[in-house]
Amino acid sequence: MPRMFGTEGVRGLANRDLTAQLALDLGDAAVRVLGDDERSEFESRRRALVGRDTRVSGDFLAAALSAGMSAGGFDVIDAGIIPTPGVAYLTSVLNVEMGAVISASHNPMPDNGIKFFARGGFKLPDTKEDEIEAVLGQDWDRPTGAGVGRVSHDTATATNLYIDHLVSAIAPVGPEKSQPTPLKGLKIVADCANGATSVVAPEALRRAGADVTVINASPDGYNINKNAGSTHPEQLQAMVKASGAVMGVAFDGDADRCLAVDEDGNMVNGDQIMGILARAKKNAGKLNHDTLVVTVMSNLGLKLALRSMGIKTVQTNVGDRYVLEEMLRGDYSLGGEQSGHVINREFATTGDGTLTALTLCNEVVKSGKSLKELAADFPQLPQTLINVPNVDKMAAKTNAKVQAAVEREEKLLGDTGRVLLRPSGTEPLVRVMAEAETQQQADEVCDRLAKVVADELTL
């Protein structure tokens, strides 16, 4: 039986796969597992924090999850609508036992998900998720009377604490208590995807001094990610060009990722953003071990550019949790994914799109260069990605004919490109990726491999 927890927690179609009962059971199981942690003796009343994105299903799922936690003896702080990295940050600074966020990130509105954070704001390791799954739905000696928990609601305080933290990353308040404005005069456009950062990102950018035009920041429960945000940047590209802004930033539904647009409307992806920030950290003496942590999906062009700047790369599997694990293991300060998840360990324990936007804008100002000029230092090899659906994804690495096809293409490309087959962490599909010197060559290689995968692995 497959694991319930995927790379981003438990996800599925809300009210079909992810029901109120399942949310209740997950809250109940989580307090049993995480409440048994030896650190829980720290407080007489154990506490949890719950936040969510703007999906309409978040209301009933938050209520059910909080009910499971409070029935298990935890006091629950409902932070309301807040970005996923905001939940991680508040889990740490409010010293609660655990945090949970209800979101399906960049997925369509009908989906939703539940993801947990341990004390300190770190995502749970696989072992803890497996423990939660193992006790899911089991009966146990639940508390009664004064032993049950309460649920409190305080969106404003939670949001303001998080915004203060974000702004302080580039504009720390000095002894005079006045707020510096390092982004003063920077004209930008922010696309909030009608998601969780619809309040946070515009306010943080404005507090830092930016002149912000905001689009897609009117969530109604149904329009999250709909033709908006990092998965649909067309509106942002058009608005940047039409408004004369110097750049734009786009978030996904839970704002754990950020992509950017230069003054001409060209996309600046996560690899290029990481390259810009890694170079800035190296120049400031803050890039630990002169190393950036990337995933197998990062473009070969990024690695080649960084190598010429004296910056090494360490590669992990896809998923910001695996990036963070490697960062902690090797004491690295910066890492992330091509998709726009960027982890700046100086300020965060997970990918934070709003933090990424602030630090990227700050680097544009400090460098005196345009985003287009900065991104040009990190050229990308032409890349093609094909999703092959309805296949036996776990056989992609073992099927003899598929592996023989991979070897043929790798030999053909030599040192000028690469190929990658990656099973999806959440869907029955295999992602086939190819990079080459020309777009035509990348397309041809990817098409050939995708056909072999479909022919050999279709269910």
Task: Please identify what each model-predicted range represents.
Residues 50-52, 190-192, 262, 346, ...:
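Short glycine-centered, acidic/aromatic-flanked micro-motifs in structured strand/loop junctions
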Residues 1-67, 71-72, 98, 151-188, ...:
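An N-terminal, well-structured beta->alpha segment
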Residues 41-53, 187-189, 290-296, 333, ...:
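Short glycine-rich phosphate-binding loop at a beta-alpha junction
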Residues 246-247, 284-459:
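Phosphate-binding and adjacent anionic-ligand microenvironments
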Residues 13, 112-243:
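Gly/Ser/Thr-enriched, mixed-charge loops and adjacent short helices
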